[in-house]
Amino acid sequence: MKGLKRTLRFNYPREWSGGVKGNQYFLGFTDMLYELNKMIPNTNARMIEIGSYMGESTMMFASSDIFQEIHCIEPFTGEEEFNQMYNYTWDEVENEFKINTRFFDNITLHKDFSYNVNNNFDDNDYDFIYIDGAHDYNSVLNDLKMFLPKLKQNGIIGGHDWGHEW
């Protein structure tokens, strides 16, 4: 799984940043969108985002104009690590998601856990799946098992900040 982890996570080459220091998450994300735009020729592209939290990545996906449909799976409950770090409640997180995504009509929120809604998505129907939900090994592995069949042939899967312990 360690080799698979490196393959599925978007690890852009450092030289792409042009030596610019700053928010590497943002730079990496915009670089990923640039590459996705080249790799997904379908103008009717569809994606699933597992774990949307406050909708910041969702907003960037929607702003990219790559995806006609973005399906977000977010229960707005669960791991408390970030909420405790930044003193947020889940209601505040959900409200921020709504604020961040309010101007986009191509976003559908599925307010639930991925294991409860995975059967709502057809197999071989999605161009891109982005996994950023629960970050422990078993949860990521289960998301991969449940959602890999949802990808079209030559579809792309990516993710963000999976657990460092594996």
Per-segment meaning from a language model:
Residues 1-166:
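A short alpha-helical cap/connector motif
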